[in-house]
Amino acid sequence: MPRAIRGVLIECDPSIKSIIVSIDSANHDYIIEDLDDERVVVKENMVSMLKAKLEDRLKENLPPEEESGSE
């Protein structure tokens, strides 16, 4: 008998999608279906955890912001 899994459609830039695919590649816990370069369907109950991991990964990759003080 077929099983249904509730999912959420995520639309993002290809660069962000590649990070999401990279996060999922370890255990395949998040992605239900990889649709195209900008869209992916993610398990509904895993969206908040995926957001947290994505934010952590982005913080690692982005340079720290410089303070814009003119002293």
From Swiss-Prot:
Location (main, coarse): nucleus
Name of protein: General transcription and DNA repair factor IIH subunit TFB5
Family in the record: Belongs to the TFB5 family.
This protein's UniProt keywords: DNA damage, DNA repair, Nucleus, Transcription, Transcription regulation
Xref: SUPFAM superfamilies: TFB5-like (SSF142897)
Compartment(s): Nucleus
Gene Ontology biological-process entries: nucleotide-excision repair, preincision complex assembly; transcription initiation at RNA polymerase II promoter
Biological role: Component of the general transcription and DNA repair factor IIH (TFIIH) core complex, which is involved in general and transcription-coupled nucleotide excision repair (NER) of damaged DNA and, when complexed to TFIIK, in RNA transcription by RNA polymerase II. In NER, TFIIH acts by opening DNA around the lesion to allow the excision of the damaged oligonucleotide and its replacement by a new DNA fragment. In transcription, TFIIH has an essential role in transcription initiation.
One Gene Ontology CC term in the entry: transcription factor TFIIH holo complex
Record text on subunit structure and interactions: Component of the 7-subunit TFIIH core complex composed of XPB/SSL2, XPD/RAD3, SSL1, TFB1, TFB2, TFB4 and TFB5, which is active in NER. The core complex associates with the 3-subunit CTD-kinase module TFIIK composed of CCL1, KIN28 and TFB3 to form the 10-subunit holoenzyme (holo-TFIIH) active in transcription.
Record gene name: TFB5
